[in-house]
Amino acid sequence: MRGLKAKEYETLEQLFKMKQGSLLKTMSYFLQSKYKTVKTTADYIYAIGDIPIALVAHMDTVFPKPVSELYYDIRKNVMWSPQGLGADDRAGIYAIIQILCSTNLRPHIIFTTDEERGGIGASVLAQENCPFPQLKYMIELDRQGKNDCVFYSCDNDDFVAYIESFGFIEDFGSFSDISILGPAWQVCSTNLSVGYENEHTYIETLNISALLNTIEKVKKMLQKESIPDFKYIEFSLSTKRWFQDLYNSNGAAGDNDFYVHCKKCKGLFSGYEVFPVKGLDGKTCFYCPDCIVENIEWCDNCGEPFEIDPNNPKKICNDCAGGLLECHSTSKKLKNNLMK
């Protein structure tokens, strides 16, 4: 498990402590030092690179003020703040900075404002024609968890399989900047996990191992000698792969409702009657009311439901299996430890 180096920690600390306006100016200067063509407005920044992939992240957080206290549990490799961390989406900003600073790779870059207020920056940018001369797909770095990839209205199975080949698993998602930009520009897009959990709450955490892992995976995508083209296909329930996998394989769709088989008893139930939960394989499964008690547990730490492993019964989900977070030092003391 690799932790943060001193300079990496300092970069993250600075990102967490900046307001959106200051971050916009800082990112504009940063991109101008790396790219020839950069456009900065009050709503977004973009830079035109030489790799036909765009990396996307948003500069705002849900919290009214930046953090003043920041803690890093070295043993568990997790960051948090009692003021609300704001890793959604400062973790995505950090990931892009690290990719540009540690390599000569120059993908297109998009930084947006006010994603948490409904994607205001992305909506303004979406009104323009795509500014990139070549753009094969977009990667947003703005997803909770460790290995999720979310596709929103993009419904190209070949694209899903390609992204999953780098070690991600398709999951559900409701909204992000690419859910606006992708359809507007007719470009395949995915949102990848950057390690934060419990976003939009004061117990938000950032798993550094997961963040660094995603950074390395994205580098591999950018380093491909041949980057494939993918046709943008609009989402529909009749063709969406997760619909086929989760409903047609485990149940049947009726004329007016979804019907799903309970994983345990195999009974057929309306989608409104069953309980969805992340299974042991990381994918969503369903249990009926009669089978919930024996097969689903609620984590004593985070409160989220998880499927019970009969061979390893426990009261804590896999994501929290390391135990509760512990603060071992102040940020000042931590910096000294990292410098050793």
Predicted feature locations:
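A non-catalytic alpha/beta surface segment that caps or lines the substrate-entry region
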Residues: 4-51
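Catalytic-core environment of secreted peptidases
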Residues: 45-87
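Zn-dependent metallopeptidase/amidohydrolase metal-coordination segment
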Residues: 53, 169-214
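Acidic/histidine-rich catalytic neighborhood of metal-dependent amide-processing enzymes
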Residues: 62, 83-163, 170-172
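His/Asp/Glu-rich mid-to-C-terminal helical/loop segments that flank catalytic regions of hydrolases
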Residues: 198-256
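Short cysteine-rich clusters marking metal-coordination/redox-active sites
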Residues: 262-265, 288, 299-302, 317-320
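Cys/His-rich microdomains that often coordinate metals
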Residues: 267-270, 287, 295, 306, ...
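Cysteine-rich micro-motifs
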Residues: 280-293, 312-323
